[in-house]
């Protein structure tokens, strides 16, 4: 791979980051804080949070088996996605490559940052060829985006192809594992040390059941994490979010129980969908959702809205004509969905 300095925008490499009051003093011995222009009333919410989220990263490192220095935390994974564009891509000059279809925020962030976004269509089985992806890259390609399990298709990408991309590409590979907890395929986290150009994204929004607190994770080399920390906003993860995340990590057994239940419910829904006469195909999924091709996605979607049930109409997405994306809910929610669909005319 290219050196980190070669990949980083020159102005970012030279940047002297903002230093907050809590960056300059983070000790625990003091009892009077008169350095940050905070209001002394309304404890504990009057104080700025730890800008480096040290306590949270320490707890997270115990679960993920990754050292805190290799962890970046942001306001949702979308913050990390935006930051890698801002850190590594020269607006109007550089480009990135991604599979298609996939998570839409990669392209949104590319467009916002004036970075060319090159799509490589997945095969009919929703897999990709590393060679096809690499063939689209050139000397101005800074990043390749992969999502596994992929959204909206739900399938794991072939591990051998992912590894080939990481090994053969000279830039950064962003591997989004937002749904990996629901897959039987192991995360790439245990192999992070082997691949200095790999950035792994995960989230508290899915398996952890914490979409409301907006907390995303990026795992990478210490150098890459240092670049992201240099350009992030000073207090990007609020104290309430940090506290809630620590509480969830302390009861990780509960998350594991939820994941097991949701995987069972996914199977229940998939089997029920196969029996519906207007369902043409249910695609295999390793996420907490699945994709189903139906006879008329728009009509069925509108019918369900009328029944007070909301799924996602993916009809306009590449390779997903007449497809609905269905998130796995509780047994009661899933049964209500199936009951409504059985009455659909």
Swiss-Prot record:
Coiled coil: none annotated. The keyword Transferase applies. InterPro entries: Aminotrans_II_pyridoxalP_BS, Aminotransferase_I/II_large, HisP_aminotrans, PyrdxlP-dep_Trfase, PyrdxlP-dep_Trfase_major, PyrdxlP-dep_Trfase_small. It comes from the Bacteria. GO terms for biological process: L-histidine biosynthetic process. Keywords: Amino-acid biosynthesis, Aminotransferase, Histidine biosynthesis, Pyridoxal phosphate, Transferase. It is an enzyme of class 2 (transferase). The modification N6-(pyridoxal phosphate)lysine is found at residue 206. Its cofactor is pyridoxal 5'-phosphate. Pathway: Amino-acid biosynthesis; L-histidine biosynthesis; L-histidine from 5-phospho-alpha-D-ribose 1-diphosphate: step 7/9. Its EC number is 2.6.1.9. It catalyses: L-histidinol phosphate + 2-oxoglutarate = 3-(imidazol-4-yl)-2-oxopropyl phosphate + L-glutamate. Signal peptide: none annotated. GO terms for molecular function: histidinol-phosphate transaminase activity; pyridoxal phosphate binding. The keyword Amino-acid biosynthesis applies. Belongs to the class-II pyridoxal-phosphate-dependent aminotransferase family. Histidinol-phosphate aminotransferase subfamily. Homodimer. This is Histidinol-phosphate aminotransferase.
